[in-house]
A protein has these predicted regions:
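Core catalytic alpha/beta fold that binds nucleotide/phospho-ligands
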Residues: 1-150
Length: 150
């Protein structure tokens, strides 16, 4: 796998089923195991998703919003986020000094970046400067915005 790959699913699909289907779609048949692990407390009930395909570690990320679930898999750390295109949040919680972009778009970019870093929302979004990061906007269903980061 040379680059990241993104796949959309119905949000009623479980995370494990979506990640397994995505891995098999990209990597072919094989034994797939997945779960979550919280780096802060060690719980497997929440935290960053993980996936193994035939005993090979694959970097994964997923996000749900409304009726949509998006997964990303890659050979290196990856983050993906999808949100409704209108969010109700204070700009100072999302925007770094000098940033003026649409809040929902900025939120998805920054959450994808924080997922790729492995910190998630434990890092304040206002500390992330988009100009210093690697991300791309993804095509999303009408009424939604999505982003991918590495």
């Amino acid at each position: 796998m040379e680059t990241e790959h993104v796949l959309w699913h119905d949000a009623s699909t479980s995370a494990a089923a979506a990640l397994a289907a995505h891995a098999r779609y990209v990597l072919g048949p094989g034994a797939v195991s997945s779960g979550r692990l919280c780096p802060a407390c060690g719980s497997d009930g929440h935290g960053r998703p993980w996936l193994r395909h035939d005993d090979r570690r694959i970097h994964v990320s997923l996000s749900r919003s409304g009726i949509h679930l998006v997964t990303a898999i890659a050979a290196r750390p990856v983050g993906v986020d999808v949100e409704v295109s209108v969010i109700d949040v204070l700009p100072e919680l999302v925007l770094a000094p000098g940033e003026t972009d649409d809040l929902a778009t900025t939120w998805t970019r920054k959450e994808a970046i924080l997922k790729a870093r492995g910190t998630g929302l434990t890092t304040p979004m206002s500390c992330v400067v988009l100009a210093e990061e690697r991300w791309q906007d993804l095509p999303a269903p009408p009424g939604y915005v999505a982003a991918l980061a590495e």
